[in-house]
């Protein structure tokens, strides 16, 4: 009874939206999809018990870490392995029992729990699947208005994005008890199937503000561990030698791989959202970190097939490795999973090293090509005075933030066209894997300031927000009064929560595309346009004309 509507590539038909057959458009089977719904339900139950325990002074950091991590496994293109999802469900049930036992030992009578608590799906795959109808994310759809269902899903998917960033922050040593409590509160509340429009809209904004705090934690974790990114020239063509490709967002894994490949003759390349790592001072101590290979996630079946070495997926996004016949040399980490692919636990990457040494590696040097990255928060703040002077002098007319998630729809050419057509006296900021639509093009500079400023990973929207705040302070105006336009490409749940963060902070007149999320009804989209000025993209030419005429 699969139903999944969380990503941009979901099925859209006149009869309704969402993947609801044997397999989703992402390659996720109905079995895995249903098990993920069971997992979400179990995690919401666990969150309710976490809140009850907190009321009596019982705080468990391990459980606070587990819930968002396991929730992360249900994001688009993260974990396709049913057995791993079953194991997460069982862990959730075990953690719940720990809390029940601890409260019983305190002779505490727990009351006021949501009806969903006490969920008992069993510990085996078939038993858990039997609960699919009870746990479906669109349960009760025939009894509630489609706008209510759309807002429930907006909150659920936004919270998934926040959970992913919480896990990224945790890996870097950043946990916050108040953030965890707010996360559990929203998880538990969503399990009650709320049906009041205003409360759901309020929750969506609360998720956005929660995520702002999480992005701040993640920024602190990355800069504490690796220093502040700095403008850096990065090679994007390979050199001869054995090789490992590291994709995803987890820079701690990249660090471990670099340590364990030192002196082996293996070259390490970043891929996708790992590209920004090359701008951090810490990683410049490793001469065998030679550059970035490939582009965004949707091209991996071709790029990984052509890569003559081992591949490590540290987080999203993974797609079917059997298509390119490289499943025997790709490895998954943390929450990532694909059936039949080797999953690595712990910090030992010797299997990856051995695989890389057994493969041919690159035989020839390709023509050098470099791009510039590293314009995250600190670099932007250092450049801000010069930028402000050029705005005052009339040399810079507008700022565009063009980025987000990439994808394979032809309509995404819009973002390439938009960047190329932007006025020559404008600056282009970009982040996320959406940057690959244009980050190898030469946009020139304005008085020594590159017109294209790569801010970093999708979560580095935090850096862009800090720049906007600095500019608004310098020009003594609100952020919405700046000559600044945000044009965001969305694909999955991280992009959803970043959008919620921007809206919760009061940022207006954002354009997003190439299509609207399928779970948002026309009425909800109208409300978002009326309240926030949120618009869908049309054509690059028409949108630019409208923006510049305002």
Curated annotation (Swiss-Prot):
Residue sites binding hybrid [4Fe-2O-2S] cluster per the record: 249, 273, 317, 405, 433, 458, 492, 494
Gene3D superfamilies assigned: 1.20.1270.20, 3.40.50.2030
Compartments (UniProt record): Cytoplasm
NCBIfam families, A to Z: hybrid_clust, PRK05290.1
Gene name as annotated: hcp
GO molecular function: 2 iron, 2 sulfur cluster binding; hydroxylamine reductase activity; metal ion binding; peroxidase activity
Cofactor binding comment, as recorded: Binds 1 [2Fe-2S] cluster.
Residue numbers binding [2Fe-2S] cluster: 4, 7, 19, 26
Gene Ontology cellular component annotations, sorted alphabetically: cytoplasm
Taxonomic path: Bacteria, Pseudomonadati, Pseudomonadota, Gammaproteobacteria, Aeromonadales
Entry's transmembrane regions: none
Cofactor(s) the record lists: [2Fe-2S] cluster; hybrid [4Fe-2O-2S] cluster
Protein source organism: Aeromonas salmonicida (strain A449)
Reactions it catalyzes: A + NH4(+) + H2O = hydroxylamine + AH2 + H(+)
Domain of life per record: Bacteria
InterPro entries: HCP/CODH, Hydroxylam_reduct, Prismane-like_a/b-sand, Prismane-like_sf, Prismane_a-bundle
Alphabetical UniProt keywords: 2Fe-2S, Cytoplasm, Iron, Iron-sulfur, Metal-binding, Oxidoreductase
SUPFAM superfamilies: Prismane protein-like
Record-listed Cysteine persulfide modification sites: 405
Protein's UniProt name: Hydroxylamine reductase
Stated family: Belongs to the HCP family.
GO BP field: response to hydrogen peroxide
E.C. number(s) listed in UniProt: 1.7.99.1
Function, as annotated: Catalyzes the reduction of hydroxylamine to form NH(3) and H(2)O.
């Amino acid at each position: 009874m699969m139903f999944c509507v969380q990503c941009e590539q979901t099925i859209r038909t006149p009869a309704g939206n969402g993947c609801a057959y044997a397999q989703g458009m992402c390659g996720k089977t109905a079995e895995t999809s249903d098990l993920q719904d069971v997992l979400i339900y179990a995690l919401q139950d666990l969150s309710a018990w976490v809140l009850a325990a907190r009321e009596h002074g019982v705080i468990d950091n391990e459980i606070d870490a587990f819930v968002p991590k396991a929730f992360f496994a249900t994001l688009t293109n993260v974990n396709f392995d049913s057995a791993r999802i079953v194991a997460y469900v069982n862990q959730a049930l075990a953690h719940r029992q720990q809390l029940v036992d601890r409260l019983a030992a305190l002779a505490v009578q727990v009351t006021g729990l949501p009806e969903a608590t006490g969920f008992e799906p069993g510990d085996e795959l078939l038993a858990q699947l039997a609960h699919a109808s009870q746990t479906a994310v669109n349960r009760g759809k025939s009894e509630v208005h489609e706008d209510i269902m759309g807002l429930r899903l907006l909150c659920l998917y936004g919270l998934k994005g926040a959970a992913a960033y919480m896990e990224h922050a945790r890996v870097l040593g950043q946990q916050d008890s108040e953030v965890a409590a707010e996360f559990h509160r929203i998880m538990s509340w969503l399990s009650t199937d709320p049906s009041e429009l205003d409360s759901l809209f309020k929750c969506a904004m609360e998720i956005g503000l929660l995520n702002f705090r999480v992005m701040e934690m993640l920024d602190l974790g990355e800069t504490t561990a690796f220093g502040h990114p700095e403008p850096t020239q990065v090679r994007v063509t390979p050199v001869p030698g054995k090789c490992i490709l590291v994709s995803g967002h987890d820079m701690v894994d990249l660090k471990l791989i670099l340590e364990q490949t030192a002196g082996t003759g293996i070259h390490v390349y970043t891929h996708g959202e790992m590209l920004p790592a090359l701008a951090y001072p810490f990683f410049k101590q490793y001469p065998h970190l030679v550059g970035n290979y490939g582009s965004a996630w949707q091209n991996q079946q071709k790029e990984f097939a052509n890569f003559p070495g081992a591949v490590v997926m540290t987080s999203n996004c993974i797609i079917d490795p059997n298509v390119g016949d490289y499943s025997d040399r790709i490895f998954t980490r943390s929450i990532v999973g694909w059936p039949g692919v080797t999953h690595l636990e712990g910090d030992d990457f010797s299997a990856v090293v051995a695989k890389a040494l057994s493969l041919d590696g690159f035989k020839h040097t390709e023509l050098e090509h470099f791009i510039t990255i590293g314009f995250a928060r600190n670099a932007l703040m250092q450049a801000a005075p010069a930028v402000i002077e050029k705005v005052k002098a009339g040399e810079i007319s507008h700022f565009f933030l063009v980025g987000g998630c990439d994808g394979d729809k032809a309509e995404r050419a819009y973002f390439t066209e938009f960047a190329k057509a932007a006025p020559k006296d404008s600056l282009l900021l970009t982040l996320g894997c959406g940057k690959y639509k244009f980050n190898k093009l030469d946009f020139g500079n304005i008085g020594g300031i590159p017109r294209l400023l790569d801010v970093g990973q999708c979560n580095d929207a935090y850096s862009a927000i800090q720049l906007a705040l600095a500019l608004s302070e310098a020009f003594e105006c609100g952020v919405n009064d700046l000559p600044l336009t945000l044009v965001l490409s969305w694909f999955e749940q991280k992009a959803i929560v970043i959008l919620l963060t921007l809206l919760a902070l009061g940022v207006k007149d954002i354009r997003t595309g190439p299509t609207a999320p399928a779970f948002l009804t026309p009425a909800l989209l109208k409300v978002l346009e009326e309240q926030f000025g949120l618009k869908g993209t049309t054509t690059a030419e028409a949108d630019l004309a409208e923006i510049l005429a305002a």
